[in-house]
Structure formats: C-alpha cells, structure tokens
Amino acid sequence: PDNTIFKGDVWSFTTEPVAYPIQNVVATSNGISEGLSGPERTVDGSGLNAADQHSDIANDMWLAMAPEGEALYIQYEFDGVYKLHELLVWNYNVQFEMILGFGLKDVTVEYSENGADWTALGDVEFVRATGKDTYVHNTVVDLQGVPARFVRLTVNSGWGMMAQYGLSEVRFTYIPVQAREPQPADGTTEVEPDTVLSWRAGREAVEHQVYLGTDPDALTLAGTSDAPSFDPGSVNLGTTYYWRIDEVNEMQAVTTWAGPVWSFATQDYIVVDDFESYNDDVDAGTTIFDTWID
C-alpha cells in the first residue's frame, strides 16, 4: 500500500422532530359566524402558504359573535387521545386588525379525554396579529404533555372593543408515545402464518403489551416484549387477525398508551417452493410419494 487517502462521500441524516402536527382536526364553536368564516377555517390551512405565512383575507379566518348569555368558545377534536406538546396560534389577521382588534387576547385553555370531563390548563394571552400577508404564528402555548382528545379555547377578551372575535389558524403538535408503523402494515393480506409482528415503538415505552385476536372488540393479551417485535407463534391460515400495542412506562404520569387496532389476514394456503423438482426417481431420492402425502 502507498498510504494514499481516498476521500469518501459526505452523507447526512436528519433526526425526527420533537413533535408532530396532529392531522384531521375537527373544529366546532358555539359562536355565530357568517358566510365562509366558520370555525373549520382555523384548521383547514386556508390562507397559509408554504412558509406558514397567513393571508389577510377575511374568508380564510374564523370570526364569530358569542350567543346571548354565553361565553364564546372554539373547540377542537382529534381522532384519538394524544400526548399534547404545543399549540401554535395565528391570530385574526385582516388588513385593519390593528384598528379593529378582532383577534383573541385573553383565553382559557381546557382539555378533555372524553369531551365530558374537562380540566383547565390555564389562562393565556394570545399575541396580536400584524395585519400583513407575511404574518407567521406568534403565540406558542405549552400544552405540558397532557393526554387529550379535545381542547377548548374560551374567549375572555379580544384586542378591541368589538363584539366579534376571531382566529386565523391553529396547529396542535404531539409527542409520539403510541406504537406506529406496524409490520405487517394495517390491512395487509396474504400474510405468512409464521410472520413476526413488529412496529415503531412509542418514544417513552419501556415495555410493550401485545393484544391479539380475531375479534377487534375482544382482544386478549398475547404477551409482553421489551423490544418492538413479537412472535405470536403459528397463526391459522385463511384468518383475519386484529392486534394492538399498549406502550408502558411506569415512571411517566400516564403509564400506558393504548395504540390503534391494526389488522392482517393470513394466506389461505401455504405455497411449496420448488414443488416441481419432486418426481418418481427412487435412486435420486426425489420421489414425491415419499415426501408429500395427502
């Protein structure tokens, strides 16, 4: 060797984010809105560009009056219980917002797992919007990792003296503490009966509880694992199975996070590889009648 140094390529990788945005959020309100200014405008991305700058167009935002004798609120529902991280807020942002003051100011934040029992997170002041079409979110609410499927914002005051209040957009983020990315993927068919189940572990999980069965409403504990994989043993052919992973960490405030129910269907029969190589050659030891018997 002549000790020549061959410089390698430079590679890179990106670590996963601290938190992920919650998708498919449903927004409702007890407020009275007109035209296209309903609460859904705060979660549908209307008015946001690729740089997360919000427009100053009124129809891209929510604006409402409180019902008589009631405090105005806007409520958000997710598709399950999440460990909430932050709430990003784009306040009401029409061109003359600095004069009108329709944006929310003092807000009470509450959360719930079932939509019936509510816990107050606290009172927060939302920063006023700029009234420009380059406006980016300027309020971040720490949601403290609470478990919730619902979040409600109750309006205590706005930035002006008007009887209407509004928001442009909100975004909730969550910590991925539940199991995800199952293998076999959810709904997979023709799965071999000796398949080992695997998944991407929840971020805080110490133990994984594996529930498995043929009835999605009556899954039983099949076993536990300290790794994100589980061998269920030989399952039956031609059967649809349902499974769920509960992520467990006794040191956390919420000790168990139940995952979604996934499914897979096993193949109807086993395919024998190289079956055509069997014949009636006794001397070669490849006789089919000595190897395969119905």
Segments and roles (model prediction):
Residues 1, 157-159, 247-251:
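Surface-exposed loop/turn motifs at beta-strand-loop junctions within extracellular Ig-like
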Residues 195-205:
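Conserved aromatic anchor
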Residues 207-238, 250-259:
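Recognizes extended acidic, P/S/T-rich segments that occur
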Residues 16-35, 267-294:
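Extracellular carbohydrate-recognition regions
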Residues 7, 16-20, 52-122, 135-178:
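Aromatic, loop-rich ligand-recognition surfaces of beta-strand-rich domains
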Residues 80, 147, 186, 193, ...:
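Surface-exposed loops/turns
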Residues 2-16, 177, 250-269:
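Extracellular fibronectin type III
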